[in-house]
Amino acid sequence: MHLSVLIPGLLRSYTAGVDRVDVEVEPGAGGGPPSLGDGLAALNLAFPGLRFRIIDEQSRIRPHIKLFLDGAQARDLHAPLPPAATLMIVGALSGG
């Protein structure tokens, strides 16, 4: 399954400056539809280290990151990916 991923500026150092990447996602466990987590794993295969900037050690989306799958906020890594989905990664900025 095809997944387009929009990369925010704060993560582009992991994608050689590319702002949009396309990855192919394999079917999920047991041959079911691939999940959002599977999509992030495919993204990490293409760009090692990127998943860790999005997902923490407990396999949770980091608090400063929001994921939007076809325009709707995605909070569950087990959520199935729709066909030809677009994932937008949004990172919060802070400072003073």
Question: Where do the language-model regions lie?
Answer:
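Ubiquitin-like/PB1-type beta-grasp interaction modules and other compact soluble beta-rich domains
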Residues: M1-G95
